[in-house]
Regions:
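Predominantly extracellular/luminal regions of secreted and cell-surface proteins
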Residues: 1-27
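Short, solvent-exposed loop/turn segments in extracellular or other extracytoplasmic domains
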Residues: 59, 98-104
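C-terminal beta-strand-rich structural cap/linker in extracellular carbohydrate-active enzymes
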Residues: 104-127
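Surface-exposed loop/edge segments in extracytoplasmic proteins
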Residues: 87-95
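C-terminal membrane-anchoring or membrane-association module
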Residues: 147-165
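Proteolytic processing hotspots in large secreted/extracellular or virion-associated proteins
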Residues: 27-84
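Extracellular Ser/Thr-rich, low-complexity/disordered mucin-like segments
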Residues: 129-146
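Solvent-exposed strand-loop boundary residues in beta-sheet-rich modules
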Residues: 84-87, 121-123
């Protein structure tokens, strides 16, 4: 939970697109702004909270696996931007594991607070990753032609049947 209202408003503004990530991070941790260059947010900021006390390693740090539905192989240098509410600073955390197939990221945290997933996104690979998933567009459908022909045939048959009677 973010106690600093200014930081909370800044994180919400980044999520809404009204503030840039580098401006917000630069306020408290200016040394990270260069490391954010060329990276995009893969997820909005969200709050990490331990479930049943969380899982800790032998050093007492939290081991967290995060589901990232938008994760694709077009993303490289995947990192977690973490705002520590305990230490009042942003930090970049390199995941211990990135599973593109399972769309999960595992990382180790000193404390749990708001995070956002960031990465370099290769637009050419991103375009290729959706190949075969979209329906064809601009293809004429013939079912209306057959329906129209059936209606005309039914009408002609009805007229011919009446003339015979």
């Amino acid at each position: 939970d973010v106690k600093n209202e200014e930081i909370l408003n800044d994180l919400l503004a980044v999520n809404n697109g009204t503030k840039s990530l580098t401006d917000v991070v630069g306020k408290t941790t200016p040394e990270l702004t260069d490391q954010l260059a060329g990276k995009e947010m893969v997820s909005p900021f969200f709050d990490l909270k331990p479930v049943n006390g969380g899982i800790k390693n032998e050093e007492g740090k939290y081991v967290v696996t995060i589901s990232v539905p938008s994760l694709t192989k077009a993303m490289t240098d995947v990192q977690i931007l973490h705002y520590s509410t305990v230490r009042n600073l942003f930090e970049l955390i390199t995941p211990t594991s990135v599973d593109y197939e399972g769309k999960t990221i595992t990382a180790v945290f000193e404390d749990l607070s708001p995070v956002a997933i960031i990465a370099k996104v290769d637009a050419s690979k991103a375009a290729d990753s959706t190949l075969g998933t979209s329906p064809k567009t601009g293809v004429a459908s013939t079912w209306m032609v057959f329906f129209g022909a059936a209606v005309v045939l039914a009408g002609v048959s009805a007229v011919a049947y009446r003339k015979e009677r």
